[in-house]
Amino acid sequence: MTRIAIVGVAGRMGRTLVNAVQQDPEASLGGGIVEPGSSLVGADLGELAGVGRLGVNATDDPAAIADAFDVLIDFTAPRVTLANLAFCAEHGKAIVIGTTGLSDDELAELDGYRERVPMVFAPNMSVGVNLTLKLLETAARALGDEGYDIEVSEAHHRHKVDAPSGTALKMGEVVAKALSRDLKEDGVFERVGQCGPRGDKEIGFATVRAGDIVGEHTVMFATEGERIEITHKASSRMTFAKGAVRAARWVASRGNGRYDMQDVLGLKG
């Protein structure tokens, strides 16, 4: 049984994670963490999540529940995540990170913990999205540089704060790597006004923020006479939550290192 604690337990994703842990027979809820000074300190996590009283209360101090969990799940903000990563290194805990929007410096800081913490870091925990990444790699290798224009589009709810989504960027990185390209050089994130014709090696990105869209991603390979589109659509946050719990169970028995969902699902190699 893997004991799991959830950071940001009062948020939309946090409440969904509580539900996912309760549904998993191989996991148990060890605790939930809210913002320092939150009025929700002491609240029952089951009541917060709408699943009934569980007898596990929210805290704003991870150290207070350090003996109650094995793995921390964090879908919050970059600086919060890095602070929790340091906590896990100090207390011998594993961590699953679904936070997106990290800067290059923050990613480097995160990577510096790979020898100190067992961590799964992935922009998207959905099994379907991670299978989609494998499909994209296969498609890009097969098509090669045969005149296919590549465009990545994504849509999310109006509350999402980073753009493009971490999943869209990961899709672009997978395609770029398969084509021996560098996304930092070939990625195009804005086209405005007289921007000129499309470059041959461009990987374009388009973003939509509207309503309550959970998450939709499409990668288009377009050439003269045909267009291939590979799409993933999420209709519920539960798909991400279940993937995160699966990752937590997996990483609980792993040594220090930085892993991703491809490792969890056995899709590498």
Swiss-Prot record:
InterPro entries: DapB_C (IPR022663), DapB_N (IPR000846), DapB_N_CS (IPR022664), DHDPR_bac (IPR023940), NAD(P)-bd_dom_sf (IPR036291)
Molecular function in Gene Ontology: 4-hydroxy-tetrahydrodipicolinate reductase; NAD binding; NADP binding; oxidoreductase activity, acting on CH or CH2 groups, NAD or NADP as acceptor
Reaction equation(s) it catalyzes: (S)-2,3,4,5-tetrahydrodipicolinate + NAD(+) + H2O = (2S,4S)-4-hydroxy-2,3,4,5-tetrahydrodipicolinate + NADH + H(+); (S)-2,3,4,5-tetrahydrodipicolinate + NADP(+) + H2O = (2S,4S)-4-hydroxy-2,3,4,5-tetrahydrodipicolinate + NADPH + H(+)
Assigned EC number: 1.17.1.8
Pathway(s) per entry: Amino-acid biosynthesis; L-lysine biosynthesis via DAP pathway; (S)-tetrahydrodipicolinate from L-aspartate: step 4/4
Binding site for NAD(+): 8-13, 98-100, 122-125
Cell location: Cytoplasm
Any single GO CC term annotated in Swiss-Prot or TrEMBL for this entry: cytosol
Described purpose of this protein according to its UniProt entry: Catalyzes the conversion of 4-hydroxy-tetrahydrodipicolinate (HTPA) to tetrahydrodipicolinate.
HAMAP family found in the cross-reference section: DapB
Keywords, sorted A to Z: Amino-acid biosynthesis, Cytoplasm, Diaminopimelate biosynthesis, Lysine biosynthesis, NAD, NADP, Oxidoreductase
Pfam families: DapB_C, DapB_N
Top-rank lineage group of the source organism: Bacteria
Catalytic residue positions: 156, 160
Entry keyword annotation includes NAD: yes
Broad class of enzyme this protein falls into: oxidoreductase
Family stated for the protein in its record: Belongs to the DapB family.
Protein name (database record): 4-hydroxy-tetrahydrodipicolinate reductase
Biological processes per GO annotation: diaminopimelate biosynthetic process; lysine biosynthetic process via diaminopimelate
CDD domains (UniProt xref): DHDPR_N
Residues at which (S)-2,3,4,5-tetrahydrodipicolinate binds: 157, 166-167
SUPFAM superfamilies for the chain: Glyceraldehyde-3-phosphate dehydrogenase-like, C-terminal domain, NAD(P)-binding Rossmann-fold domains
